[in-house]
Structure formats: C-alpha cells, structure tokens
C-alpha cells in the first residue's frame, strides 16, 4: 500500500505571505516527490501551485483604524472558518505565514481547540524592533518558528520556542536578474527614458496614504524632466484601487500587475 500523502495546511493572509507560501509549496513538492497535499488560505501564487484558497485574501488587505473597524466582523468570520476548516481537514501540520496579526489569532484559536496538530509560523514578528514581549508568549501557541534573518532565533529560543533560520527569499531568488530590456520592449519605453519604480504597498490603507504623495512627486518630476518614466508594480489585493488612483491623476504611469512585469520592472 502506498504511503499516505503528507497533509499541510497553509495560512497566508497577505501578498508577501502568498509569495513565501508558493515557494514553500514548490520546495515541499520537490522534497516529497509530490507526495504532499495542500489546503488553506493563500493568494494567486499559491493557487498556481495547486492550493484552493478558503477565501479571497483581499479581505485581509487592511491597515489603519478607519478600515479595520468596519472589517472586524468579516475578519473574525474568516478566523473562525479557517480554524473550523483546519479541524475538518486534520492536517499533519499547520503553517501560518507572515501576516502576524491574522496568523496569531488563528494559532491561538486552534490551540484552544486542543487538536494536537503541530503549529508552525513562518516569518518571525519583528520583536527586535517593537513589542519585544511577544517573544515570551509565542511558545504557548506556536510549536516551531521559521525565521528569514539569521539574528532572529536568539530572540525566541530563550523563551522555549524552537526556532530555525531558513534564509531570505530575496537573497535566494532571481530578483536581481529581471529582464529590463524585455520590459522596455514590451511597453515601448524609449532607451533614453529613466524608469522610476513607485512602491505604495500592498494594503489599502498604505496605498491610500502613500500613493497620492508619490503621484504628486511624479507630477513635479515630470515637469522638471520629461525623461522620467514611472512604473507602479502592484498586487491583486489593491490593483483596482491603484489603477483608479493613477487614472484619476491624469499622469501617464504604467501599472505593472503580472509577476513577470513586477520582476522585470
């Protein structure tokens, strides 16, 4: 009888976690020769790797009091549904990825269910920068922590939390090997144009606060030098809002949505 496939439940609530989750899925499929099945929450990149997301993570792209308050019922419902789905699936392990605000609530709620399912979190909360006390209590609902930076384990291991440094995807990826020539050719950008990339974030509140400032800066720069060409790489969670704001500015600015275009930009 063939071995049972490894069941892994992934929870990624933001585009950054979606990218990490997709990389993790590829690595695990390779490591297990495909003898693994995934369930959980994720975005487009994880969906391409075979995940059928429990819900659209655009619902979690919130930041700031004005957006959080009206979204509380929906977020709480997603937390309950995620935990209920984990209990139903009975995976071998649950891996929450980044998005600590959402992930920690899922982990705590699942622990209260006393399922005995191992709980792993991928991407340490930045306790070295703020809210250091979180490191003291994480062991209560996280069984193992995976960190991106080599100095991070020392902040958690003294508090009985097994922690492993696994490397940063930016260093391991081909982020520096984007094809700028192909990007210019695809969008007919003249060689003399100087490309400036505008990065307003992946949360609605970030975009609302930052993009107007960036657009006004772009307007002023265009008035002083016509050789600037502005590109706004964006993700599905905020793409509609970004495009509306760019159109409303009246400026000729390219919004890059595909992974390839974002990479090449």
Regions found by a protein language model. Give the residues of each.
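A short acidic (Asp/Glu
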Residues: 106-107, 191, 243
